[in-house]
Amino acid sequence: MILGDRDLKYYLEKGWIKIDPLREDTVRENGVDLRVGGEIARFIKTDKVFDPDNPDPAFFKIEKIEEFIIQPYEHVLLTTEEYIELPNDVMAFVNLRSSFARLGLFIPPTIVDAGFKGQITIEVVGSSFPVLLRRGTRFIHLIFARTLSPVEHPYQGKYQGQKGVTLPKFRTEASKFLSLHQK
């Protein structure tokens, strides 16, 4: 069941869904708009090979921003201004606001799992022309869906509690894989 604006306001009022800071104008008909936060990570163009088993943060440049230009076809990680907390029976779909999609910007399909807490880091792919983005601009739209029952294992993954832009974390996955297959 997708939560409409009345449901969302009720869940927010009861504290079942937490969004901080929450602005009233961001609660929409069937979701909540989240805003561009104050930090991005640009992907560094290189011929070096990225190895997920030995991640190197030198592939990214983290910048504190009030505004930034996403260049044509550039890939950028950005964080939301808001910190969210979801209960064990609510998940969210992350969508780019249509005004930005109509400019040619793109984000990959992204889900926020039930039980997640943190700021959302999202990948944005640039358009065919440069686009200026400012901190505080409503940028992504979360559509919340209630599960039929609380999930058995709420999200407790490597991105739980993240604040600011968070780079990809692969080492844990590689370590888990190796530990499972070396027995």
UniProtKB/Swiss-Prot annotation:
One of its GO terms (molecular function) is dCTP deaminase activity. Its EC number is 3.5.4.13. It catalyses: dCTP + H2O + H(+) = dUTP + NH4(+). InterPro entries: dCTP_deaminase, dUTPase-like_sf, dUTPase_trimeric. Pathway: Pyrimidine metabolism; dUMP biosynthesis; dUMP from dCTP (dUTP route): step 1/2. DCTP binds at R97, S98, S99, F100, A101, R102, D113, Y155, Q162. Coiled coil: none annotated. The keyword Chloroplast does not apply. Transmembrane segments: none annotated. One of its GO terms (biological process) is dUMP biosynthetic process. The active site is at E123. Keywords: Hydrolase, Nucleotide metabolism, Nucleotide-binding. Catalyzes the deamination of dCTP to dUTP. Homotrimer. HAMAP family: dCTP_deaminase. NCBIfam families: dCTP_deam. Belongs to the dCTP deaminase family. This is dCTP deaminase. It comes from Sulfurisphaera tokodaii (strain DSM 16993 / JCM 10545 / NBRC 100140 / 7) (Sulfolobus tokodaii).
